[in-house]
Regions:
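Conserved S-adenosyl-L-methionine
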Residues: 136-251, 256-258
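Generic alpha-helical secondary structure signal
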Residues: 8, 119-124, 145, 171
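Long recognition/docking surfaces used for binding and targeting
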Residues: 34-37, 41-130
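Accessory nucleic-acid engagement/destabilization modules that flank
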Residues: 1-47
Length: 269
C-alpha cells in the first residue's frame, strides 16, 4: 500500500542517518523532520529544487563534496525557515552529512507528499513516530488511549476552538481532529485545522513534529507556536489571531517541571 511504501522510505532514511552520522535517536528524528519541512515547502511553492541527479548522487557516494546539491538545499532551507518562522530560528541548520542528505533526497524526490492521500501519509508518519518518539523522550508523552478517552469525554464540536497549551507532538489536537472527522460526515478538515485547533509548546523540535502531523492532514495554515504558554497569554492570543479565547482546553501539562521564574509566578498569585 502507499502507506507501507511511505513508511518504508521514512524508516530507511531514519536508519541510514542514525547508522552513518553518529546522531542520537532524538537528533536523527529532529533532522528527518527538518527535511520533511523542506520537501513540503518545495512542493507547495512548485520550486522543483528538492532533487538530486544521478550524477550528483554517484559523486556524493565517492566522497566528493558536490557543491551544486549542497548549495541548492541550503538555499531551499533558508526559504523554508522564513516560511515557518514560528518553529525555526534563523540560525537553524541541517546537521546531517552530505551523503545522508543525498540519500534522503534520493529516497523522497520521486514521491509527492502533498498529492499522497491524507490517510496514507498521515498514518505513515504516525506509525514512524510511534517507533521513534519514545527513544529519547517517551516519559513526556501521554498514552494514546488516555488522550482519546479525554477527547471523547469532552465531545468537541466543529465550531469550537480547541487549544493545548503544552501540546508536545500534538497528540490531543490530532485526537480531537480524528474525533471531529469520525463524527461529522462533511467536515472541512482544512478549515477546522486552520481556524479551530491551536497548540503551544516551549520545545521547538517537538513543536515541529506537531506542526508536521497537522500539515500532513491539512496542508495550509497550522496554528502551532513555539512559546511558553505560562508567560504572555494575551500576546499569544493575539499572535494566534484569537482574542476571543478558546472553547476547550485539552492538555496534560508537565506537572513534574518546577517553575522558578518570579515574573512568571507573579501572574498566578
Amino acid at each position: 500500500t502507499k502507506e507501507d511504501n511511505l513508511l518504508r522510505k521514512f524508516e530507511e532514511i531514519h536508519d541510514y542517518i542514525y547508522a552513518n552520522d553518529g546522531l542520537s535517536p532524538q537528533q536523527t528524528l529532529e533532522e528527518f523532520v527538518k527535511i520533511l519541512f523542506i520537501k513540503i515547502f518545495d512542493e507547495n511553492e512548485n520550486l522543483n529544487q528538492f532533487t538530486i541527479s544521478t550524477e550528483e548522487w554517484n559523486e556524493l557516494k565517492t566522497g566528493k563534496p558536490v557543491n551544486s546539491i549542497i548549495e541548492r538545499i541550503a538555499k531551499l532551507f533558508e526559504k523554508t525557515k522564513e516560511a515557518y518562522q514560528d518553529i525555526f530560528d534563523a540560525d537553524d541548520r541541517i546537521k546531517i552529512s552530505n551523503i545522508a542528505l543525498g540519500f534522503t533526497i534520493n529516497k523522497l524526490q520521486g514521491i509527492s507528499l502533498l498529492n499522497s492521500s491524507q490517510d496514507a501519509k498521515g498514518l505513515a508518519f504516525q506509525k514512524f513516530l510511534s517507533h521513534h518518539e519514545k527513544d529519547g523522550r517517551g516519559q513526556f508523552f501521554t498514552p494514546e488511549p488516555v488522550i482519546d478517552f479525554c477527547v471523547a469525554m469532552m465531545q468537541p464540536k466543529p465550531n469550537e476552538t480547541i487549544i493545548d497549551p503544552a501540546c508536545g507532538s500534538g497528540g490531543f489536537l490530532m485526537s480531537a481532529l480524528k474525533y471531529l472527522q469520525n463524527n461529522n460526515d462533511k467536515l472541512n478538515t482544512k478549515k477546522v485545522v486552520a481556524k479551530n485547533l491551536f497548540g503551544l509548546d516551549i520545545n521547538k523540535s517537538i513543536a515541529r513534529i506537531a506542526k508536521m502531523k497537522l500539515l500532513l492532514e491539512a496542508n495550509g495554515n497550522i496554528n502551532i507556536l513555539c512559546t511558553n504558554s505560562l508567560e504572555d497569554l494575551d500576546g499569544i492570543k493575539l499572535s494566534l489571531a484569537n482574542s476571543e479565547g478558546f472553547d476547550l482546553v485539552l492538555a496534560n501539562p508537565p506537572f513534574g517541571a518546577k517553575i522558578t521564574n518570579t515574573n512568571t509566578l507573579s501572574k498566578f498569585d
